[in-house]
Design a protein with these regions (language model features):
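Membrane-interface motif at the C-terminal end of an N-terminal transmembrane signal
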Residues: 22-35
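Domain-terminus/edge residues, biased toward the C-terminal soluble/receptor-binding domains
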Residues: 203-204, 216-472
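Active-site-adjacent loops and short helices of periplasmic peptidoglycan-processing enzymes
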Residues: 2, 33-226, 230-235
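N-terminal Sec-pathway targeting helices
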Residues: 1-16
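Catalytic-site microenvironment of enzymes
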Residues: 7, 87, 259
């Protein structure tokens, strides 16, 4: 048997290793250019990403935020003692006046009542067409003095949807009481539920003791009311066209009366008090004075008690942009003066907001970006926006063409050609920058969506060849 040529075998081994090395490098280079399907992050990885992003970026964790650029505070002729206006698409605060003052919300409380109802409907536990029983404590005749009323009466047949209309349009305290009794079995349980929802939203200055808004011990602030209104409209946009935008409401109607009450006279005199049996249809206009008066107004809710003054949660949508404003402690010695103040303040805020800002939407940019990855166990890193505003609030005054300021918005997408080595979840690798006339409006970081570990030495060496020898 011939003696093996050790030197020759060594050279063959080196050549084989070198060939394998070059093949590996070639495969890596090819797949970098033409990547296979990228593995989606699992639920655990997505949950970690959400946690890290919420900790790192303030604009994710808060309902309301200051504008991401500096502006000169507006000096508006607003008679209400406290007020705020926000861009509903992103929560940017456009205007504020003593917005952290605690004030009774009065009947704006009923927005929280409707919020709970919508939640219960979503679970399937209750439905809009449910017929709601009316115990004596829900009748109009048993409401406190000077209550706003839907005019619920003994033996009435009323649906949950009608009670919601009565709460939203004519601000019926009796309707709110009936809803509380039906949804949670009583006022105390319903108030506990309302306050739980308040806490879940992080509203620390808001608290309720009853559901109609009659009590001066109910408390909120314009800022927290605006935050709630934003969440309410985001989660239940149907509330606007189904309830808050309705101009009037007539109750009771023929179908609401029991058989025995249908034979009673339809004309009644309430000047000496409200009877148990109500058979006369009562027509009431929506308490929001800007509905049908101010272009684009489709909600939201008024409130008044002596301790709160004339409150108004107002929302208007024009040209795709929705503004929410809250005015509280509005002045007026009578209802007519209070309504005039609501119209004046609401119009002043909305006129200014729509003439000063526009919403810019570009959803195509707020997507995933696949970046080549070398020296790592995977060959692509997916970058996602750290947060995704529905729209960018653009200041009209910064544009040269104030008629079409959105045409001047410039977008700068900054991405790396490739990423080297291990990647941590939520690690920044680029950004989307929006500018107007050289002013940065907002810069949204692009971050990795999951962890990718460093590759072994063999793969890292192959990637080195891919990068330098194969010109990748």
């Amino acid at each position: 048997m011939k003696k093996l040529n050790i030197k020759k075998l060594s050279l063959l081994a080196v050549a084989a290793i070198g060939a394998a090395y070059l093949v590996t490098a070639g495969i890596r280079a090819y797949t970098l250019r033409r990547p296979a399907k990228i593995a989606e992050p699992d639920e655990k990885q997505l949950a970690l990403l959400e946690t890290l992003l919420n900790e790192k970026y303030e604009r994710r964790g808060k309902i309301l935020l200051p504008l991401p650029y500096r502006t000169i505070p507006a000096e508006l002729d607003v008679g209400a003692e406290a007020a705020i206006a926000i861009d509903a698409s992103n929560g940017n605060i456009l205007y504020e006046k003593d917005a952290d003052r605690q004030i009774p919300p009065a009947s704006m409380t009923k927005l929280f009542v409707l919020y709970v109802v919508f939640q219960e409907i979503a679970t399937g536990r209750i439905n809009l067409d449910d017929v709601v029983p009316l115990p004596p404590e829900t009748w109009a005749c048993n409401m406190p003095p000077h209550s706003s009323l839907m005019f619920l009466g003994k033996n009435h047949i009323v649906t949950l949807e009608e009670l919601m209309l009565g709460s939203a349009i004519c601000s019926g305290n009796d309707a709110a009481c009936a809803i509380a009794n039906y949804v949670c079995g009583g006022m105390d349980s319903f108030i506990n539920r309302m306050n739980q929802e308040v806490q879940a939203l992080g509203l620390t200055q808001t608290h309720f003791v009853e559901a109609s808004g009659y009590s001066e011990k109910n408390m909120t602030t314009p800022r927290e009311m605006a935050a709630f209104a934003k969440v309410y409209l985001e989660r239940y946009p149907e509330s606007l066209y189904k309830f808050h935008s309705k101009l009037s409401f007539t109750y009771p109607q023929e179908h609401n009366l029991s058989w025995e009450d249908k034979s009673l006279p339809k004309h009644q005199d309430f000047s000496q008090g409200i009877p148990e049996h109500i058979t006369m249809p009562v027509y009431q206009k929506n308490t929001n004075p800007l509905l049908g008066l101010y272009e684009g107004c489709d909600g939201l809710k008024t409130g008044y008690i002596d301790e709160s003054g004339y409150n108004l949660a107002l929302t208007v949508k024009r040209n795709g942009m929705r503004i929410i404003s809250i005015t509280m402690e509005g002045k007026g010695s009578c209802t007519a003066e209070g309504q005039a103040g609501r119209i004046h303040d609401g119009s002043a805020i909305m006129d200014w907001a729509f003439s000063t800002f526009r919403d810019y939407e570009n959803p195509l940019l707020l997507r995933e970006y696949s970046i080549p990855l070398i020296f790592a166990k995977e060959q692509r890193a997916i970058l996602v926006p750290a947060y995704k505003p529905k729209a960018l609030t653009v200041p009209v005054t910064a544009a040269q063409n104030r008629e079409n300021p959105l045409e001047e918005v410039q977008i700068n997408l900054v991405l790396p050609d490739k990423i080297k080595g291990a990647v941590n979840p939520a690690q920044e690798f680029g950004y989307i920058e929006y500018t107007l006339n050289g002013h940065i409006l907002e810069s949204i970081p692009l971050v990795s969506e999951k962890e990718i570990k460093k590759a072994c030495l063999w793969v890292r060496a192959a990637d080195l060849v891919s990068q330098f020898v194969l010109k990748f």
